[in-house]
Amino acid sequence: MHPQELSNPAGAIRWWVYQRERFPILANGTLIMAFSSSAVCFSSLLREEQGLPHWSAFAAAFITSFIFFLQLRIADEFKDSEEDEKFQPYRAVPRGLVTLRELGFVFLIGAFIQLGIALWLYPPLVGILLIAWAYLGLMSREFFVREWIKSRPVTYLWTHMGIMPLVDLYATATEWMPRGATVPDGLIWFLVVSFFNGVVIEVGRKIRSTDEEKPGVSTYTKLWGQRGAPLIWFGFLLVTAISASIAGSLIEFG
């Protein structure tokens, strides 16, 4: 059944429906756990540490990263609200399942949890957290050039993927900062991989067949064509693989 054909449930069940439609906890949580754990382990391996990193680094990296990705979803709900109302009224916010005010409250609760974790694990982590928040805030406001950036899809893509290395930097920092270390040599390649991973996912999810295209909904197949978009996506995938190979060589992986 299409979401627009569903009635909106009442009470707490609304949030279960919201996560199912807009931010599946199990699916996203599994990916984010792999994302954050690899960041912690990569940092430790770069510094040639023996044994597994402390559990607190894994926990802090996972919870904070999970909240970051939830905040990204909520930020999208805000900045896309007018377009969703017009072109995709069946989505959760336009159809009244949850309100933007409620989502904003969830966003703030998440931020307080992130802050609390940083202060608990190692207070200087707050510095990186603030940088990531600031970038997320700029993204939410379309860098204060909404019409300009929306008319330039490639610029829109790379500026919005800039958040990925920042989230990954924070995740790695939960391992190296509490130990009094500096940014590990070679970490830049891991951040490059995270950037292009984000690009691959973002471009891939907006490649549609002709009959799946919808009026008013931007896709990369509309921008680059039915043949061009998959080819460009494959190019990004290749760059990601090369970057990952370089990063892997730094820890003698593979």
List PLM regions with ranges.
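Intramembrane alpha-helical segments
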Residues: 16, 20, 102-177
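Multi-pass membrane catalytic core of lipid/isoprenoid biosynthesis enzymes
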Residues: 87-129, 224-251
